[in-house]
Amino acid sequence: MPPHGHHHHHHGHHGHHEHITITPVYAPPQVVQPIYAPPPVVQPVYVQPPVVYPQATIVLETGHHHGHHHHHGHHGHHDHHHHGHHGHH
C-alpha cells in the first residue's frame, strides 16, 4: 500500500505540480496576450509588404495559438483526468 500510494503520489505530483505551477504563472500573461494580438492585426495596414505581413501573423498566431491551446487543453485534460482517476481510485 505505501509503495502504491507513493508511486501514485509521485506520478500525480510530478505532472500536476509542474502544470499547476506553470499554469497560474503563465495563465495571466496568456490571457492578457490575446489583447495584444489586435495591434498586429492593425499593423498589417502599416506593414503592407506581404513578406513581413505573413511572417508577423505566423509568429504571433503560433505563439498565441500554441500558448492558449497548450494551456487550455493541457490544463483541462490533465485536471479532468486527475479528478476522474482520483475518484475512480
Swiss-Prot record:
Organism, scientific name: Dictyostelium discoideum (Social amoeba)
Protein name per UniProt: Uncharacterized protein DDB_G0272718
GO terms of biological process kind: response to stress
Segments of this protein annotated with the region Disordered: 1-25, 60-89
Compositionally biased tracts (Basic residues): 1-17, 65-89
